[in-house]
From Swiss-Prot:
Signal peptide: none annotated. Residues 139-144 are annotated as: 3 X 2 AA tandem repeats of [DE]-R. It comes from the Eukaryota. It comes from Mus musculus. This is Polyglutamine-binding protein 1.
Length: 263
C-alpha cells in the first residue's frame, strides 16, 4: 500500500525515504450542471418563430419544439410542412390523472350521498323502533300501576277485615262483661277456677316446683304395701327404705288381683 504524499515528503526530508513515488494525476471530468434542456444556440440558428424553442428530451435523447406561451409541443420544426402541434405527454398524463382523481372524487361523493340517503331511510326505522320502545315502556308502567292499585286494594281489604275482627272481639268482650255485671251470683261454684283460690303457704307447690295437690294427696292408698318410707320423695337421690316385708307384698298383690277380677 503506497504511503501518502505528505508522509513521503516528511520522511524524505529526514533522509529516511530516498525514493519518492510520483504523485498520481487526477482525472478531470467536465460535467454540465445546467438543468435547462433548452438549446438556445439551435433555436437561434434555425430561426424559429417567437415563443418557440428547441428542447432536448433526456428520456429519449431526441429534440422537440416547445411553445412557451401555449405550452404545446411538436416533434417537427414549425417550418416543416408536416408540423403537428400536440400537448406534451407529461401534461396529458397529468390531465388524465386529474380526470381520474376528479372521477374518483365524484364517485366518492355519489357513494356518500347514497350512504346519507340510506341513513335517512334508516332514521325513520329508528324512529319507529323508538316509538315501539316508548309504547312498551308505557305498557310496563301501566301494568305496574295496575299492580300497585291491586296491592293497595288488597291491603285495604285486609285492614278492613282486621278492623272487623277487632270490633267483633271488642263486642264479644263487652257482651260478656255486661252479662257478668248483670248476674247476681255465679251460676256454678264449680265453674270458679281453682287457680283463683288462695294457696296454703305450707303447700309445697307455693314455694317450689312441686305440682299442686288435691285433698287426697298424701293419704294412704288402699292395697298399698306399708313400707314406712316417704312416698312423696322422688328423684334419683331418694330411695324408699325400709323395704316392705315379703308377706305384705304378697298380700298387696293378691288384693290387687282380686280387685281386677271383680272389675
Amino acid at each position: 500500500m503506497p504511503l501518502p504524499v505528505a508522509l513521503q515528503t516528511r520522511l524524505a526530508k529526514r533522509g529516511i525515504l530516498k525514493h519518492l513515488e510520483p504523485e498520481p494525476e487526477e482525472e478531470i471530468i467536465a460535467e454540465d450542471y445546467d438543468d435547462d434542456p433548452v438549446d438556445y444556440e439551435a433555436t437561434r440558428i434555425e430561426g424559429l418563430p417567437p415563443s418557440w424553442y428547441k428542447v432536448f428530451d433526456p428520456s429519449c435523447g431526441l429534440p422537440y419544439y416547445w411553445n412557451v406561451e401555449t405550452d404545446l409541443v411538436s416533434w417537427l420544426s414549425p417550418h416543416d410542412p408536416n408540423f403537428v402541434v400536440t400537448k406534451s405527454a407529461k401534461k396529458v398524463r397529468n390531465n388524465n390523472a386529474d380526470a381520474e382523481d376528479k372521477s374518483d372524487r365524484n364517485l366518492e361523493k355519489v357513494d356518500r350521498n347514497h350512504e346519507k340517503s340510506d341513513r335517512s331511510h334508516e332514521k325513520p326505522d329508528r324512529s319507529h323502533e323508538k316509538a315501539d320502545r316508548n309504547h312498551e315502556k308505557n305498557d310496563r308502567e301501566r301494568e305496574r300501576n295496575y299492580d300497585k292499585v291491586d296491592r293497595e286494594r288488597d291491603r285495604d281489604r285486609e285492614r278492613e277485615r282486621a278492623f272487623d275482627k277487632a270490633d267483633r272481639e271488642e263486642g264479644k268482650d263487652r257482651r260478656h262483661h255486661r252479662r257478668e255485671e248483670l248476674a247476681p251470683y255465679p251460676k256454678n261454684k264449680k265453674a270458679t277456677s281453682r287457680k283463683d283460690e288462695e294457696l296454703d303457704p305450707m303447700d309445697p307447690s307455693s314455694y317450689s316446683d312441686a305440682p299442686r295437690g288435691t285433698w287426697s294427696t298424701g293419704l294412704p292408698k288402699r292395697n298399698e304395701a306399708k313400707t314406712g318410707a316417704d312416698t312423696t320423695a322422688a328423684g334419683p337421690l331418694f330411695q324408699q327404705r325400709p323395704y316392705p316385708s315379703p308377706g305384705a307384698v304378697l298380700r298387696a298383690n293378691a288384693e290387687a288381683s282380686r280387685t281386677k277380677q271383680q272389675d
